[in-house]
Amino acid sequence: MACAEYSFHVPSLEELVGVLQKGLTDNFAEVQVSVVDCPDLTKEPFTFPIKGICGKTRIAEVGGVPYLLPLVNEKKVYDLNKIAKDIQLPGAFVLGAGAGPFQTLGFNSEFMLLVQTESEHRPPVNGSYFARVNPADGGCLLEKYSEKYHDFGCALLANLFASEGQPGKVIEVKVKRRTGKLNFVTCMRQTLEKHYGDKPVGMGGAFIIQKGKVKTHIMPAEFSSCPLNSDEDVNKWLHFYEMKAPLVCLPVFVSRDPGFDLRLEHTHCFSHHGEGGHYHYDTTPDIVEYLGYFLPAEFLYRIDQPKETHSFGRD
């Protein structure tokens, strides 16, 4: 499987603090960005399989939207233990957003990836969640993957942030009350693009929506049998929801595409109250509060890039 490697521009954490503080202030009423020790992510509300997101950071984009749209390509299935080896980091902790492993589940879903991949010293741990449309009432069904399934698959497309899963220094971002039009992730990504221009910066991590509600979507359980050829077609196919805090989100974003047909940002979320899906934006700007922990990635790995592409279905 084709895998291209690219070295990101990697600013210091201190420099990123200043850049993000300035950019976020244009979009949120209260902004506080600082360098801190990564909190213990095994604790609530994160409940990740590892304590941190530090060490040999990298972003992987696997597959892509053209394997889902206009029509699904069901040959495009992946294994996260193999991906960890492809990105030169066997045993990596991988988090991110992707399509659920329909090859195991038997249906399509939103996937919130949290996987400690296998290494010589320890077996893999799958802390991932998946969200599907409830066939009974059209609501959200969120489940922990490992409660029923024991593989490490994903499918079609995935945007991943990988590291050694170590404790260490990270960027903490606290914002309250959205005053601008951009969602939290888009604001950070566009801030980086504006500042760094043609020097692409990649970031990932985790954030909590502590107060408020957000617009999300979940893909239908059945892949579309008729071609979806535009954002309008896709939006008619998706199921949209308003979900309530607290939500744990898994963002992966890149300031500018260095020529790999990247999805520039992709964020999925889960909760401990049965809601989860693909994050779009908060719907309660006057009360929303975000708290996040982020790191820049050293490398980009582009795995199984689609040869034929298009630009829709990436919101």
Curated annotation (Swiss-Prot):
- For this chain's UniProt record, which GO biological process terms are given? DNA damage response; regulation of DNA repair
Q: This chain belongs to which protein, by name?
A: Ester hydrolase C11orf54 homolog
Name the CDD domains for this protein.
DUF1907 (cd17298)
Q: Which Pfam families match?
A: DUF1907
Specify which residues bind Zn(2+) according to the UniProt entry for this protein: 266, 268, 278
The record describes its quaternary structure and partners as: Monomer.
Q: What does this protein do?
A: Exhibits ester hydrolase activity on the substrate p-nitrophenyl acetate.
What SUPFAM superfamilies would the database entry show?
Answer: AF0104/ALDC/Ptd012-like (SSF117856)
- A Gene Ontology molecular-function term? hydrolase activity, acting on ester bonds
Per the UniProt record, which EC number(s) apply here?
Answer: 3.1.-.-
* Top-level lineage group: Eukaryota
What cellular-component terms does GO give this entry?
A: cytoplasm; nuclear body; nucleus
Entry keywords, A to Z: Hydrolase, Metal-binding, Nucleus, Zinc
Traced from the root, the source organism's taxonomic lineage reads: Eukaryota, Metazoa, Chordata, Craniata, Vertebrata
Cite the SMART domains for this sequence: DUF1907
Provide the protein's localization: Nucleus
